[in-house]
């Protein structure tokens, strides 16, 4: 118990330092576009450090049973540009197939109540951990069908990215939200005075989005984030334990960030009535943006690391 307490204490100190750094920074998720960003970052990292793994993935990707949908998004692209774009579209693919036979809605999140009501709501909602474990096993199995491994690849790219978003790991229960706020989907806020009301969850999902074609967000963020946050600057990329244990740790990080930053500020006045949605403060906007940037680039690196573990690549 003392060892676990020590680990938790170190983790909270680490997260507090992150928030302190964000609070002193200037202001400069996830949507489909942000998932494309994590996919691009993962590709870049593998290209730099594990190019043989990318080659090993090519025949697996070629066997994807929904390849026609993916290829339709890559028209006119060739060579490296096409290979990188394929990673981007694979990362968002689970969102694109919602409502189809490939859909697993509960794999996108794994929520724990972080309010004082956690004592009466101790269980988890969502099965991201189960989805991660299942797809990791399939991708790691050389004897599995290539089509199944390709589907598992897309889900791993997506799930690992999803759970970096704090509100994919936490929700709030209270007298206002007796059955929870459904990870911020029932509470409305506004980014600026006079702005349109937006769900708190959507606020976080879309925080880095850029207007334009589907890859506009990836083009705006993928390379700048890697320059700002190279692996050496991210101590959270130090791993220990099984893939399952590492995934659990990533969920714990997001849970703590939801408590320390996500469910603060205007959320404390958020309302089910969109018309009465309060305005988030400039400080909240700045901190949430900085957190999103770091979590997105971390998610991209972790996707690459997950694939290395699954395919036993150095």
Task: List where the protein language model places each region.
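N-terminal, motif-rich segments that launch catalysis or mediate targeting to/interaction with membranes
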Residues: 28-159, 166-314
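Bacterial N-terminal signal peptides
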Residues: 14-22
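N-terminal signal peptide c-region/cleavage motif recognized by signal peptidases
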Residues: 24-26
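Bacterial N-terminal signal peptides that target proteins for export
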Residues: 5-14
